[in-house]
Swiss-Prot record:
GO terms for cellular component: plasma membrane. Binds 3 [4Fe-4S] clusters. This is Ion-translocating oxidoreductase complex subunit B. [4Fe-4S] cluster 2 binds at residues 117, 120, 123, 157. [4Fe-4S] cluster 1 binds at residues 49, 52, 57, 74. Its main location: membrane. It is found in: Cell inner membrane.
Length: 192
């Protein structure tokens, strides 16, 4: 019975010693993050789509905060994200498409040819916003409300049954921006 208590005590002592060493090391070798980069990263939509030319939202936030990259390259975030970053950095807002002369980008939507889909789930694994639903060896489909048109699901498909199609702007497909219409709350007087 004493050997069990000795073993338990030895393990507890080892846990305390290694915990203290890890605690000291985490404080001693801590890397300070730039608070501006953290704020920019919090503003970005975290879709990790790569449309900005960076592998994810965090590298793009670091490029904007530390290297002075353009603030208008986040396609899923659009103008709202660009304006928030411009306000945070106290810089002039830039056109969302990067150049004044270019036409506004057409919203694209991934469409799966369900007759040719073999249910391999490679597109589901590639989608950064979970816009594709389906199960193994079953038909997959794209939820159009969630799809950002990032093109990351097209290449992994072994049967090439996914294509990007432009979305026709109709009242049903339009993404309404609630900030475009100024809303004012009017106080109501209650009469007894």
């Amino acid at each position: 019975m004493n050997t069990i208590w000795i073993a338990v005590g030895a393990l507890a002592l080892l846990g305390l010693v290694f915990g203290a060493i890890l605690g000291y090391a985490s404080r001693r070798f801590a890397v300070e993050d730039d608070p501006v980069v953290e704020k920019i990263d919090a503003i970005l939509p975290q879709s990790q789509c790569g449309q900005c030319g960076y592998p994810g939202c965090r590298p793009y936030a670091e490029a904007v905060g530390l290297q002075g990259e353009k603030i208008n390259r986040c396609a899923p975030g659009g103008e709202a994200v660009m304006l928030k970053i411009a306000e945070l950095l106290n810089v002039e807002p830039q056109p969302c498409d990067g150049e004044e002369q270019q036409a506004a980008p057409v919203r694209m939507l991934a469409v799966i040819d369900e007759n040719n889909c073999i249910g391999c789930t490679k597109c589901i694994q590639a989608c950064p916003v979970d816009a594709i639903v389906g199960a193994t060896r079953a038909m997959h489909t794209v939820m159009s409300d969630l799809c950002t048109g990032c093109n990351l699901c097209v290449d992994p498909c072994p049967t090439h049954c996914i294509e990007l199609r432009p979305v026709n702007e109709t009242p049903d497909s339009w993404k309404w921006d609630l900030n475009t219409i100024p809303v004012r709350i009017i106080p109501v007087e209650q009469h007894a």
